[in-house]
Each structure stands twice: as C-alpha cells, then as structure tokens.
Amino acid sequence: MTMTLAFDVYGTLVDPMGMSRLLAEDAGDRAEAVAALWREKQLEFSFRKGLMKVYEDFGVCTRQALRYAMATHKLTLSEERENALMAAYLSLPAFEDALPALKSLRGEYPLFAFSNGGYPALEKVLGHNDLLDQFEGLVSVDDIKSFKPDPAVYTYARRATGSWEKPLCLVSSNAWDVIGARAAGLLAIWVQRDPNKVFEDWGIQPSAVINSLSELQETLKNL
C-alpha cells in the first residue's frame, strides 16, 4: 500500500527516560522515579492545555512538569540547574533502532516527524541523533496551537504531509497517540517498547503492533 509515514518523536524515536542519568545528580536513587513523573506530567499538562484551549509551547509544559516532579519528591533545583536540564532535554538519546529503521524506509515511503514538540526543539533533538536528514519534513502542533490527541492535530498532519489522496500512517510508542490517530481516521502502528505495557481498551485497535522499529518495514507490507 502506498502511504506516508508520520513518526512520533518523544518515546518513539528518542527516549525521555534518558534524563534519569542526569537527574541522578539531583535526585540520587530517586532519579528514575523523578524522570518518570516528569514525563507523565509533561503529557498530562499538554493534554489539559489542549482541552482548555490555553496553548503553550511543549517546552513550557516540559519545564512546568520538571518543577512538579522535583517538588513532589521534595527536591529543589537552582535556576541554573533547571536551565541545564532543559537544555539537556534537547539532546535526549535516540533508541538504537531509530536510525537504521529510518534509513531502511527512506526512499520507499515519504517520512515525516510528527510531534507535540515545537520546531526548534525537534530540529535540535533529531539533529543531535543524526535523524533529521532522514525526514522529508517536520510537522509540529505549534502550527495549529493544540496538542495530540486533538483530532484537529491529526487532520492538520494530513494536510501538512500532503496525504489527502493516500493513507497517512502514524508510528508511535504512545498508546494514547495511536488511539487518537485511529479515531481521526489514520492508520497507526503501536511500537510496544515495553512488553509489560498493555494497550488501553477503548474499543479502538492499532493497525499493527510491533516491538521494535526494526520490524516496521516488514509490517508495512501487510497493512
């Protein structure tokens, strides 16, 4: 099937939990817990801002979530250290399967990065991991001032990728993103990076499930 691929970035191509190593300096043995809460609240804050129609850049959500996670664990950061962690977020590590998968698909499918992140952040984190040049373009929610899983965001992605006449397939490790895309009429493949994670039972199923991006090329042949 001829289609365009839209890759989620955070959690799919790059690993937000990569911040736990840096947080060890501030949180000690609680670093992983802080990093997990940081990510959880980053998403929650973006969802809430989208529903409330009070859009702010994803970086603002990220900073607010960091402050919440630290405060919850009764930890403090200096302004300088907070800024350093925010800067480090722009160089999150890529998953090992990301670059090989994109290279194998490039030329066979139009590839786009599709994210709640803003363009400057996407360019930095993808460029840091040598992923940026694999894409035909970037699609950011910043263009329409809302966040996934708002249906308008997925509709916009169709327009931005030129996918009105052919299918657009989201590739994401975030179940909420996959459900949002499917509800909006897109194909969507769930990357189940953690075998212990279950897909939420909303009566909406992913188009396919893979455990690694290395399985993507073969899976696409069967959609």
Regions found by a protein language model. Name each.
Residues 1-43:
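Active-site neighborhood of HAD-like aspartate-dependent phosphohydrolases
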Residues 1-2, 103, 114, 118-223:
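Asp-based, Mg2+/Mn2+-dependent phosphohydrolase catalytic module
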Residues 19, 34-35, 81, 131-134:
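Hydrophobic side chains within well-formed alpha-helices
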Residues 21-22, 37, 64-68, 84, ...:
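Alpha-helical elements of Rossmann-like donor-binding domains used by nucleotide-donor carbohydrate transfer enzymes
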Residues 27-31, 72-77, 130-134, 162-163:
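Short helix-capping segments at alpha-helix termini
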Residues 29, 33, 53-57, 96, ...:
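Residues at secondary-structure transition points
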Residues 32, 46-83:
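A metal-dependent, Asp-based hydrolase signature
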Residues 59-60, 77-113, 119-123, 151:
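Short, acidic loop-to-helix structural element flanking the phosphoryl-transfer center
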